[in-house]
């Protein structure tokens, strides 16, 4: 391709050879030899690519000349940086000096020791700051309030400040109790479901717990026997199991309440004394036989004769209810008395008993924890009742 940029107008666009003023070519000087960038005439006849595409511009550049801008070649030049502003200084400037106090607070300059003592001579100010008969030369002491109760609030300026600590505790206290109650409620509601899962797992030892009612006349999708839909045959059995579980939980709470009432001395339970056929509960006027030892819990009055006197026997309250149940059951089921020697013998083997308990806890501990973990939320409730009731 030719490199001559100053050919003698082979396509006839212009009457002159070179019109680019860069090499002093104009109508007065049509000679194109001033352009040093030229080749021989056969190379100049070759068509080059220019601003109008291949074959539309001669090798000397097209309609506007041979310069790169005329041929459509754009050259990006770096923009000159803007001139530095004359009203801007680089770096952190020092803080200007504060104006003097006499300029910013002229009223403060009016108060000096002389002005202050002169102000104290005012009876209104003197009555607020100085006691009756006091001098203004000494230290200013607050005076006790001598106003009447009806006018005591008039001396206060503005509303009293709110105690944010009391307000915060007033809001946070019930909120924390509500949150703890909701947490315990949600945990307690999982107790029947956990016990139901344990109950149904006894029927699927080593297998998958799948409801057996899904292949009946009204088939349902695969589901656990603890979550049967109402259309499943096992739905009524699930309700029966949960009803029994709720009764068991209520019985457990009732037993704990009875033991708690007995521990607090609110449930006078009197065991049967050997050789006596009558028992009584409640207070007695006098005791024919004083209580043995000292006890912080109320004694139990038993064997009430006809004269109104009774024998007071101190009963450990934590064992009173259990002992009462044992004696009540032994009086009606004689075969229970045969278990007493066996229990005494078993308790006498203390090392063996402890080793057995340790072995059972080591072997059954994880499974027992998974079974009894739903009952853990009941422990704070029982502890609260035990302490505060």
UniProtKB/Swiss-Prot annotation:
Glycosylation sites: 309
Post-translational note: Isoform M is N-terminally acetylated by host at a ratio of 90%, and N-glycosylated by host at the pre-S2 region. Myristoylated.
Keyword Transmembrane helix: yes
Region (Disordered): 76-102, 133-154
Classification via InterPro entries: HBV_HBSAG
Ranges for region Pre-S: 2-163
Protein name: Large envelope protein
Native organism: Hepatitis B virus genotype D subtype ayw (isolate Australia/AustKW/1991) (HBV-D)
């Amino acid at each position: 391709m030719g490199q001559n940029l100053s050919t003698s107008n082979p396509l006839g666009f212009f009457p002159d050879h070179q019109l680019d003023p860069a090499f002093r070519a104009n109508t007065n000087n049509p000679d194109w030899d001033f352009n040093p960038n030229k080749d021989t005439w056969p190379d100049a006849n070759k068509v080059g690519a220019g601003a109008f595409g291949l074959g539309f511009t001669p090798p000397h550049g097209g309609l506007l000349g041979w310069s790169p801008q005329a041929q459509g070649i754009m050259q990006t030049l770096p923009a000159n940086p803007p001139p530095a502003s004359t009203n801007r200084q680089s770096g952190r400037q020092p803080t200007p000096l504060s104006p003097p106090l006499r300029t910013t607070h002229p009223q403060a300059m009016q108060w000096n020791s002389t002005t202050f003592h002169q102000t104290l001579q005012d009876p209104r100010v003197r009555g607020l700051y100085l006691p009756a008969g006091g001098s203004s030369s000494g230290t200013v002491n607050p005076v006790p309030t001598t106003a009447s109760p009806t006018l005591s609030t008039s001396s206060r300026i503005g509303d009293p400040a709110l105690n944010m600590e009391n307000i915060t505790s007033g809001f946070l206290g019930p909120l924390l109790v509500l949150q703890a109650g909701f947490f315990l409620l949600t945990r307690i509601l999982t107790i029947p479901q956990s016990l139901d899962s344990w109950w149904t797992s006894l029927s699927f030892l080593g297998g998958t717990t799948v409801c057996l009612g899904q292949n009946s006349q009204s088939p349902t999708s695969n589901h656990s026997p603890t979550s049967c839909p109402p259309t499943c045959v096992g739905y009524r059995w699930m309700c029966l199991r949960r009803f029994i579980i709720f009764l068991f939980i209520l019985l457990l709470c009732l037993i704990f309440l009875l033991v708690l009432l007995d521990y607090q001395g609110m449930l006078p339970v009197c065991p049967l004394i050997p050789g006596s056929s009558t028992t009584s509960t409640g207070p007695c006027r006098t005791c024919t036989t004083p209580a043995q030892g000292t006890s912080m819990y109320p004694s139990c009055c038993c064997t009430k004769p006809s004269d109104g006197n009774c024998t007071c026997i101190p009963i450990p309250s934590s064992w009173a209810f259990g002992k009462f149940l044992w004696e009540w059951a032994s009086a009606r089921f004689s075969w229970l008395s045969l278990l007493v020697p066996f229990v005494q013998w078993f308790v006498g083997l203390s090392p063996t008993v402890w080793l057995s308990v340790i072995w059972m806890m080591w072997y059954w501990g994880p499974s027992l924890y998974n079974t009894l973990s739903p009952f853990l939320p009941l422990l704070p409730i029982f502890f609260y009742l035990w302490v505060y009731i």
